[in-house]
């Protein structure tokens, strides 16, 4: 009777098992392989890198446009007919997808670092394709439907590029450990040269990126202009329902420079404040008068409009995620808000703030279609509100407006040639923050034209515009921006130059050190060991050399351990092949103790 014990025993490799198991479901030792990665799996790795780049760009873009989330929701409301905050779910989904892809990429890089064969599991491949397709569709949709918003990406880079550059240097320096390992393992000089040239071309490209960075916040502190004046967009819509008395009062409590309002005229000729064409979003008209829900707000009498509640929607939809922060008294006050008339706003703001007024055209069959401008002007003049504090944005019949109210600040909402602006006696421009460059701001200032930019909610954007010298901004988030004491960062050019040159030198020194260390660690390794000879779960091409090497390792351990029979002591090349084929599914396992040799014990009874 013959009893056999295992030829070898290997210690468990939990980290390696988790690495290959999570990435390719290769949890067992015999499933892992140090063979070269197949071309197909290399293609999947390339696809993984591309997906990572796209999801990173998309996530950064979606974070960058958080200043315009309300605008995005408003756009979808006009398309879909009901209000919902889509921005946060998209942000959460994008972050989750990026985290998943980043995790797969880290696992793949770890495979390369330890010399394991890449074999992405089919479930991960499906997830990769779904995320890639979804990201491409999302980016294409934004490019077609929200094209101007891509300019926000470039604007945000003016504020973040100096710091993203430092992060990129950290990443490329860490990646050099893997590249240096591949360089050290490469046996051909041509392969080493290719790896070296390609990697350092990328590295030096990263080092020179700061030469292309231009930011208004890279400036001398003494050149920083005054803080931009703040204009409350429809009051303070993050603290109270927009276009209500409470909203304007909250804005005035912050001592803002001005208030912005959209003026509509009722069926019986009363100017009131409303941004939407209908009343569905900002009132309870669907509950109180369902038959009037889709009728234009301008086609209702003021007596009907006064009966509507203009505050409950704010608590229900919570458009800015701020309703929970209201005090109990503010919560009760919000529930009792009604539509605000122009006369109420004029009385509230008189002597306290300037007004940026925009008129909305009534429907074609409105009785005041031809005279709504005169009615509005008369209401402003009758209130006694100081004319020099009114910024008049409505672009039609400006000669009539200048005649009736010569003190108004004529404000244009479009970019035009300077000759046309002067011809129209334009004193101020009201533009979206993506429509004007730093150089254009300087040009307008030299022409004695003041510029107001809308809608600026994020502190980073406010800081960037502050450094650029913007005179004033319109904001939903005035209560936060009013407390910003200075730009989030400002750096003299000399200090910035010193910072990025120092960072480049440190990175380069570390990379050289890593290459030297990896060459010293791995450059002399040319022999096989039992840990590096494993069978792959995938079908591989047969290799006579590998089979013979396995047999040599096994029989060298047998000869060192105990005596064996003559039948096993002499092996020809053909016996190697026969034995290898018979044991093609067996994998040796590592030593029980580090540095110990595997032992074989063969006991034969009757001999």
Curated annotation (Swiss-Prot):
Cytoplasmic side: 1-42, 111-125, 182-192, 518-607
Disulfide bonds: 15-18, 25-571
Gene Ontology biological process: cerebral cortex neuron differentiation; lipid metabolic process; negative regulation of Notch signaling pathway; neuron differentiation; neuron projection development; Notch signaling pathway; positive regulation of cell cycle; positive regulation of neuron differentiation
Major localization class: membrane
Factors inducing expression: Up-regulated during neuronal differentiation by retinoic acid. Down regulated by high NaCl or urea.
Domain GP-PDE: start-end pairs: 228-485
Glycosylation: residue positions: 301, 336, 352, 374, 448
Entry keyword set: Cell projection, Cytoplasm, Disulfide bond, Glycoprotein, Hydrolase, Lipid metabolism, Membrane, Neurogenesis, Transmembrane, Transmembrane helix
Catalytic activity as recorded in UniProt: a 1,2-diacyl-sn-glycero-3-phospho-(1D-myo-inositol-4,5-bisphosphate) + H2O = 1D-myo-inositol 1,4,5-trisphosphate + a 1,2-diacyl-sn-glycerol + H(+); sn-glycerol 3-phosphocholine + H2O = sn-glycerol 3-phosphate + choline + H(+)
Region (Disordered): 582-607
PTM field: Intramolecular disulfide bond between Cys-25 and Cys-571 is reduced by PRDX1.
Membrane topology: Multi-pass membrane protein
Extracellular side: 64-89, 147-160, 214-496
Pfam families: GDPD
EC number: 3.1.4.2, 3.1.4.11
GO cellular component term, pick one: membrane
The keyword Cytoplasm is annotated on this UniProt entry: yes
InterPro entries: GP_PDE_dom (IPR030395), PLC-like_Pdiesterase_TIM-brl (IPR017946)
Coiled-coil parts of chain: none
Subunit: Interacts with PRDX1; forms a mixed-disulfide with PRDX1, leading to disrupt intramolecular disulfide bond between Cys-25 and Cys-571.
Function: Glycerophosphodiester phosphodiesterase that promotes neurite formation and drives spinal motor neuron differentiation. Mediates the cleavage of glycosylphosphatidylinositol (GPI) anchor of target proteins: removes the GPI-anchor of RECK, leading to release RECK from the plasma membrane. May contribute to the osmotic regulation of cellular glycerophosphocholine.
Record protein name field: Glycerophosphodiester phosphodiesterase domain-containing protein 5
Lineage: Eukaryota, Metazoa, Chordata, Craniata, Vertebrata
Gene: Gdpd5
